[in-house]
């Protein structure tokens, strides 16, 4: 009996010694929830007018045009009794998805909206020639949100030489045209060609606390921080049309698609929070469309968190015209909408 115990003890000691010599197991890397920023969704009040503007003024091309109703769409968007027309449009490699709610009609963009209000979101359209692009927009009588194009100063190493201008679409949604200098931006924006309006570099959203937003976009969604900057001065103030504007800017990217840019106004701090009762049919509602591998797994990452689900959970979509099989709508810490979709 004693001999057997000694043998067992020697075996355990030998096994422990062998295990200590083996390399530590490397934990499996969890893939990011988000594969791509697929498109930027915008709720519009009049689809025919919006399509005319984006195609005739900004050179987007229509990809699809469908009308949707029924229980699945209602649960997905959190709007009962809806009928919506959804139009996808492309500029370069990037997509926008315009949605008009034929019923129920939503509220307009507040006429006193400012660039530091936390419902602010825009798309940054890259242009090859700012002077030509601005002249074209003037010819089409777009509504200015900046007094004119601004060139950010060279003392700022992360933004110096960038030219940008804010304006509005017919519903009052903010838009930006932007031209990178040769040493900044993706190399594809510097390729020679005869087009002026090239594509969408990013969508920008105003946030109240960059740290809280990184907990959502970086930590929960798995997007990567690819750029940071702090911008201030008269050029930045006039671009945003906010006196005393000083911004902390953080850029995140998924594996594919446009970036998401977080804009935190360090000063002034008087930007208003998004109304708590915003619904998807209100014209201040944007929804950034994110492609995920598995919608249920992505949804579980948010269960029990302080992030707000608009959909009651993952919604299975039988209508193939929408281009995905399941998804859900959620709001980030500042109320910006994101729809996570699995194909």
At which residue positions do the language-model features occur?
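Vicinal oxygen chelate
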Residues: 24-32, 125, 131-198, 205, ...
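Short, structured motif recognition centered on aromatic/hydrophobic residues
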Residues: 37, 41-44, 60, 87-89, ...
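Extended intrinsically disordered, low-complexity coil regions enriched in Ser, Thr, Gly, Ala
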Residues: 48, 52-68, 103-104, 111-119, ...
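Bacterial N-terminal signal peptides
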Residues: 7-20
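N-terminal secretory signal peptides that target proteins for export/translocation
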Residues: 1-4
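Core segments of cupin and vicinal oxygen chelate
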Residues: 43-94, 132, 139, 155-159, ...
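Post-signal peptide N-terminal segment of secreted/secretory-pathway proteins
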Residues: 76-82, 86-89, 93-96, 100, ...
């Amino acid at each position: 009996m004693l001999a057997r115990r000694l043998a067992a003890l020697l075996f355990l000691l030998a096994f422990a010694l062998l295990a200590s010599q083996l390399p530590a197991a490397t934990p499996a890397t969890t893939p990011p929830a988000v594969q791509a920023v697929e498109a930027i969704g915008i709720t519009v009040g009049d689809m025919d007018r919006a399509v005319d503007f984006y195609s005739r003024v900004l050179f987007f091309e229509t990809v699809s045009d469908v009308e949707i109703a029924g229980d699945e769409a209602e649960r997905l968007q959190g709007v009962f009794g809806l009928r919506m027309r959804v139009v996808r449009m492309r500029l370069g490699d990037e997509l926008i998805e315009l949605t008009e709610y034929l019923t129920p009609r939503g509220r307009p963009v507040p006429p006193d909206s400012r660039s530091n209000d936390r419902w602010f979101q825009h798309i940054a359209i890259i242009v090859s020639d700012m002077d030509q692009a601005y002249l074209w927009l003037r010819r089409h009588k777009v509504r200015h949100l900046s007094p004119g194009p601004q060139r950010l100063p060279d003392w700022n190493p992360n933004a110096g030489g960038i030219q940008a201008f804010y304006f509005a679409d017919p519903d009052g949604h903010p838009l930006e045209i932007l031209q990178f200098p040769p040493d900044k931006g993706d190399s594809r924006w510097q390729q020679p060609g005869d087009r002026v309006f090239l594509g969408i570099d990013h969508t920008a959203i105003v946030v109240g606390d960059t740290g809280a937003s990184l907990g959502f976009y970086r930590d929960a969604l798995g997007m990567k921080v690819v750029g940071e900057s702090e911008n201030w001065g008269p050029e930045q103030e006039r671009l945003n049309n906010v006196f005393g504007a000083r911004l902390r800017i953080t850029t995140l990217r998924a594996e594919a698609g446009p970036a998401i840019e977080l804009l935190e106004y360090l000063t002034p701090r008087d930007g208003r929070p998004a109304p708590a009762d915003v619904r998807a049919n209100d014209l201040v509602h944007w929804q950034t469309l994110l492609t995920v591998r598995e919608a249920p797994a992505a949804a579980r990452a948010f269960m029990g968190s302080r992030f707000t689900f608009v959909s009651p959970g993952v919604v299975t979509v039988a209508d193939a015209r929408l281009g995905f099989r399941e998804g859900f709508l959620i709001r980030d810490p500042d109320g910006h909408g994101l729809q996570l979709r699995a194909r």
